[in-house]
Amino acid sequence: MKLVQMEQDSEALKEIDYNYNPFSVSEDQVTDNILAMFDSVGVLDALDIPADVIHAIVLDVKSQYTDVPFHNFNHVYTVLQMCYLILKGSTLVQKIVSTPVARFALLMSALCHDMNHPGNNNDFEIKSESELAILYNDISVLENLHCSSMFETLRRHNLHKFMDSNRGEWRDFRDIATTAILSTDMSQHKVLLQKVLGAVKDPGTLEVKDWVAYIVHTADLGNLTLEWDLALMWEDRIFKEFENQAEKEQKQGLEVATYMLNLDEVSRAKIQMGFIDYVLLPWWEAMNKLIPNDLEERLVCLKRSRENYTQVLSVLARKEQGGGAGGNEGPEA
């Protein structure tokens, strides 16, 4: 049975926007949205992938996400949704990420980029000398896990058989999707940023796989470009993961990163402001130049989040001094 196309008034696609909260709807609705996004960009028809096959793949992928606070299935849904909206909203991106294989790689790598995430970072895996760290030689440990999990799952569903081996479609898919997922390793962020800044001056230096990787990385760094209530929800979740990791490290006698300790409101706001100033703003400003103006609204929201944290710190400082919150001042919604 064929999925309903966007132009045929798909109910699932009507729900999709940047500030869509997957926690507010049923798991079935989230799955329907994912299937509709894959269908809407034309990859299922072009690659002759039956709806029941992609449905089975999505459910299999979903089963490999654990109930950790942040790196769960709803996180990757949010990343996938943002990648989809960037693709659908930018004529430039549509022209560059134009083939069915490239578009399929964009959406599938977004969906799979945190598969089997344990709820801690690479630093923990390396410090604890985990089996994963040994397997992947301390290099992009979790990203290699996510990537491997994706390909094992896709091969289990014989997805490679739907791609033309004579045209190298499966090989191209593997190249693009692998590049995208490995590029979500934050240790690669500074290198990626320099490449994006260089590409702003000369976009012709980029391959399709670079564009896909940058879009996925952008979406992965997108929480603070959402409405304030959603941004705070994701903030709570990432700091809960930090607390959980710090507790595990303390139990194992491992060194704990300072940003994972004593996470009171002031510390959290300062960490978030620093993350915006030194990571998010430079990246989003560069991407907004690479994809001219198509990310402007998200960039405005990011700057508003920065202003909101300034207000949060101001309110907390007045409370500390015994002056109360004062009036109706507070962060913008």
Regions found by a protein language model. Name each.
Residues 42-68, 88:
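Internal amphipathic alpha-helical repeat/solenoid segments
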